[in-house]
Regions:
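Carbohydrate transferase catalytic cores enriched for Leloir-type hexosyltransferases
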Residues: 1-392
Length: 392
């Protein structure tokens, strides 16, 4: 059987890119010579990166025919009568693909009329927190709903990264529970490339950061809660005369200017450092020099940075409503309360508290690894079942 992995993210998307790359490498390992695995990407710059990782790669582009098939998707009987296939599906069929694996949610799944597919759901936060502009504005909510309602019922398998997310998928979209597999993510495999003394020295030379800062690697979206962290720093400075430094690393999706304005308004110019998007090789050094990873984000139920922090022995400050992800491996706070976050920041300065959280992080990472390996056994079995049915 030949499986196609569809990878349409570029490196600037951050966590989504790393999760997708992990998923591709995982699938290749699970195929283990039994099945052939080929990656298809719309981003030409991904080709050398994927090839260097040992993956077979094909580059494709979206065509006007794909758009026409998508628009006609509301009239499936007409499509059947016209016998129109998208250029996307034609390319896959031309490569003798048997099964398509979407490592990210994708409208392209709705273009497939003959080929079966595995679909990945990263989150359902447009339903959990519809009040944020990145979900509410410009039709983002409607677009996500359209994709999920059209693609999920026809998927031979749906991958979610937690049992919490699996339950929400089943409840909200009416798919059968046995067709949804909860399989935890793993830390970015690219993180290891910067976990060495040479990378540490290079990163320090580039960024010139103080020791013991609070680290928040996140794109600048409203739901990421950067401003809540600034408010907490103001409270700490007011109550104890000083506050720790904070380092933001991530690309801008429209909210950075507001965060920068708040830094000036709060008088935190000397305490907050904006690094922008940083290369993968600098992430581990930035984690290693941090006092803690702080994530005042609303979206979940899981996130990638906690896995990275646990793998590098960095303590985690995490929202209470995401406790299902981190278990005992975080110090929690109310994401709607600057006072609560300030209290957590104050507590994490205690070495005993830090060591407790770090030790729990090691345990949590092992627990998630065991869950992932169990899910991989199920996934391999599902691939074998599909292969047997597909060849009939």
């Amino acid at each position: 059987m030949i499986i196609a992995g569809i990878f349409t993210q570029d490196v600037s998307t951050g966590g989504g890119y790393h999760q997708g790359l992990n998923a591709l490498l995982q699938m290749q390992a699970l195929c283990n010579g039994k099945h052939e695995f080929i990656v298809f990407t719309t981003v030409p710059a991904n080709e050398p990166i994927l090839a260097q990782a040992g993956l077979k790669v094909r580059v494709f582009r979206t065509t006007l025919r794909d758009l026409a098939v998508f628009l006609l998707g509301s009239f499936p009987l007409l499509l059947m009568r016209l016998r129109w296939l998208s250029s996307f599906e034609k390319k896959l069929l031309g490569e003798n693909i048997d099964l398509v694996y979407f490592v990210h949610p994708s409208l392209r799944a709705t273009l497939l009329q003959r080929l079966n597919y595995i679909f990945t759901v990263m989150d359902l936060c447009h339903r959990d927190f519809p009040e944020f502009p990145e979900v509410r504005n410009t039709g983002a909510f409607e677009c996500r709903e359209q994709v999920y309602r059209a693609a999920l019922p026809k998927a031979v398998l749906i991958l979610a990264d937690s049992s919490e997310l699996k339950e929400r998928i089943v409840r909200r979209y009416g798919v059968e529970a046995e067709r949804v597999l909860a399989m935890p993510f793993q830390p970015s495999l690219l993180l290891k490339s910067g976990d060495n003394e040479a990378a540490m020295a290079e990163a320090q030379s580039v960024y010139q950061l103080p020791e013991g800062y609070l680290f928040y690697p996140a794109q600048f979206w409203s739901h990421k809660g950067h401003i809540r962290l600034l408010e907490a720093l103001v409270l700490l400075r007011r109550n104890q005369g000083d506050c720790p430094s904070c380092v933001f690393a991530g690309g801008d999706h429209g909210n950075r200017r507001l965060v920068e304005q708040k830094v000036v308004e709060f008088g935190l110019q000397g305490r907050v450092h904006f690094l922008g998007f940083v290369p993968s090789g600098h992430l581990a050094p930035l984690y290693r020099r941090a006092q803690a990873l702080v994530m005042p984000t609303y979206f979940g139920p899981t996130n990638l940075p906690p896995l990275e922090a646990w793998s590098l022995d960095v303590p985690l400050l995490y929202p209470e409503h995401l406790r299902g992800h981190a278990g005992d491996a975080a110090l929690y706070f109310d994401v709607d309360s600057a006072e609560s976050l300030a209290g957590a920041i104050k507590k994490i300065a205690d070495p005993i508290c830090r060591e407790r959280i770090v030790a729990a992080g090691r345990v949590r990472l092992k627990e998630l690894s065991a869950e992932r390996m169990s899910a991989e056994v199920v996934l391999v079995r599902q691939l074998d079942v599909f292969c047997g049915r597909h060849m009939m």
